[in-house]
From Swiss-Prot:
Protein's gene: gpmA
Record site: Transition state stabilizer: 182
Protein name: 2,3-bisphosphoglycerate-dependent phosphoglycerate mutase
Free-text function comment from the UniProt entry: Catalyzes the interconversion of 2-phosphoglycerate and 3-phosphoglycerate.
Annotated InterPro entries: His_Pase_superF_clade-1, His_PPase_superfam, Phosphogly_mut1
Active site: 9, 87
Organism: Streptococcus agalactiae serotype V (strain ATCC BAA-611 / 2603 V/R)
Length: 230
């Protein structure tokens, strides 16, 4: 059986401060750095050997991937970065404290923005300091592709081509794959892999630690699912 290991990035500085992060390129906290290292140690203890790895273009996921692979003594494994694995874009909520947003917009509205499958948060202003439209890492993308806000539905729509073009073919080829990504980009792919309904995915949480493992047969049927170390 082939293995797909999802590692959500370790705690970021904005996770720690309870801020909406999205596409803002925020670093790992000290705790998050240790979580990434511990993830790698769990991988090594489980005897999982990777053939390739994928991550986003955001430093918290890139660093988590590198730290985990290093701790697993597999830093040589090829890593491909893609914006399609980025966190969900939180639009105009980016940088806001979650508790303060609830006070401003109401608990129910913020809950809907965060947890619903297809409701979009307010757009991010084009001149916002965190706007991806002026970020050099997205210069090769058509401007119309760069989001100003996303829900989980849109996140899945842009992550799915990467699954179909990169991750799934590697698994079908018998390769073990590491994906260092984000809570919502992982949730989106989990929805697709497990064929969860729009309502079912609302209750799925992906922790910063430990890594989540999926095992597949040669036809890419899901055989088992578990968290390392649990």
């Amino acid at each position: 059986m082939v293995k797909l290991v999802f590692a959500r990035h370790g705690e970021s500085e904005w996770n720690k401060a309870n801020l909406f992060t999205g596409w803002a390129d925020v670093d790992l906290s000290e705790k998050g750095t240790q979580q990434a290292i511990d993830a790698g140690k769990l991988i090594q203890a489980a005897g999982i050997e990777f053939d390739l790895a994928f991550t986003s273009v955001l430093k918290r996921a890139i660093k988590t991937t590198n730290l985990a692979l290093e701790a697993a003594d597999q830093l040589w494994v090829p890593v491909e970065k893609s914006w399609r694995l980025n966190e969900r874009h939180y639009g105009g909520l980016t940088g806001k404290n979650k508790a303060e947003a609830a006070e401003q917009f109401g608990d129910e509205q913020v809950h809907i923005w965060r947890r619903s499958y297809d409701v979009l948060p307010p757009d991010m202003a084009k001149d916002d300091e965190h706007s991806a439209h002026t970020d050099r890492r997205y210069a090769s993308l058509d401007d119309s592709v760069i989001p100003d806000a996303e829900n989980l539905k849109v996140t899945l729509e842009r992550a799915l081509p990467f699954w179909e073009d990169k991750i799934a073919p590697a698994l079908k080829d018998g390769k073990n794959v590491f994906v260092g990504a984000h809570g919502n980009s992982i949730r989106a792919l989990v929805k697709h892999i497990k064929q969860l309904s729009d309502d079912e995915i609302m209750d799925v949480e992906i922790p910063n630690f430990p890594p989540l493992v999926f095992e597949f047969d040669e036809k890419l049927n899901l055989v088992s699912e578990y968290y390392l170390g649990k």
